[in-house]
């Protein structure tokens, strides 16, 4: 029987050391901090959260919800993060949900917490047009991988010095300058006023007679036409010079002549009044047989049914009976 060999395992069954961190973006220094911005739907998936903290070091990584930052429930520390990653999934599954929450209020809260040179990215490297515009308005610079916060130049005050040459020249001069001679005193005289002077320049720059040529003077001046107020009838002015009064008068005259012609059509001649005017003596009706004094009339007489009467005699009809 061959001898048996027994080996002893000295490795611990449970290792307390943290798992090696895997960072998608090489930070170059373990002290750089990363901020993960997650949409609200990722909070219900424990496997996604577990995978995130296996890929990022917990000691240098913070996780915040986009909806809480947008509502103002979270205050981020200023000038802290070197990398901000928006969790949209590598295939862009949560892109619309995450980018919808990247409003101006969120950018206002993110930019102060970013260090100079910090980067803002998404997992699928995609930003919409509205998100890019808000990022640029917030002060970020667009790069190939996302957006970056540029280093703000330091401002310092520069003291302004006065020109010292004048002071040095003033110090070297020890003598007082000689006083300038006083101007001679003019004697007081009485001024004369010329009333004929019109205080105008006699030199005319433009001759007003040459402004209009002979052709301009011969050209008729067309006055503006009188326009009535809205909702009112067109009427000519009292001293109308545009021709509107004459035009309206001609229109009225034409309408008057037209009305007179219409009246003349219905006017009866003297011969046509025989049947109507009973005062005409020696006239017969249109039948040519019966006169006013005839007691018996023919069938075609217009006076049929009327008794004999004299010219000028008044005829009254009472109860369908002629009364002479």
Swiss-Prot record:
The gene is dre2. It is found in: Cytoplasm; Mitochondrion intermembrane space. Residues 28-158 are annotated as: N-terminal SAM-like domain. It comes from Aspergillus niger (strain ATCC MYA-4892 / CBS 513.88 / FGSC A1513). Belongs to the anamorsin family. GO terms for cellular component: mitochondrial intermembrane space. GO terms for biological process: iron-sulfur cluster assembly. Component of the cytosolic iron-sulfur (Fe-S) protein assembly (CIA) machinery required for the maturation of extramitochondrial Fe-S proteins. Part of an electron transfer chain functioning in an early step of cytosolic Fe-S biogenesis, facilitating the de novo assembly of a [4Fe-4S] cluster on the scaffold complex cfd1-nbp35. Electrons are transferred to dre2 from NADPH via the FAD- and FMN-containing protein tah18. This is Fe-S cluster assembly protein dre2. [2Fe-2S] cluster binds at residues 226, 237, 240, 242. GO terms for molecular function: 2 iron, 2 sulfur cluster binding; 4 iron, 4 sulfur cluster binding; electron transfer activity; metal ion binding.
